[in-house]
Amino acid sequence: MRKVKTMNVIICIDENQGMLFNNRRQSKDIKVIEDIASLAKELWISPFSEKLFIDEKVKTNLVIQVRDNAISHAAEGSYCFVENEKLMPYQDKIEQLIVYKWNRSYPSDFKLDLNLNEWKLIETIDFAGNSHEKITREIYKGKQTGI
């Protein structure tokens, strides 16, 4: 029986797949938030990420759903921004993995726990950020499903 893919997960990583250092995000950029808003109408996030999206400087039409462990509550077909949770337990539910790369190395003690080589890269876009010269957005789909 084929497993059903149900959500689109969005993450930000550095060159070493780092996501956090000492329980703090490595970096942020308003252009990433605006790009996420162009992809999704509704976004599930944890309270940890709320300030990134509920900010007077960021004007989006996103409907924000804030929940502890948002990835476990995200509705089918929805988008979920993840900064401080492991993805491995949810990999069978991820239809697309949208990865923003800072193209820099930062200190990190919490890293992406999925191997991107096991996913099929379907799109790569580079764009200038507000505080980063170049940000890369990559979109992956699971190889094993052929989706």
Residue ranges of model-derived segments:
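Enzymes that bind and transform nitrogen-containing heteroaromatic metabolites
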Residues: M1-I147
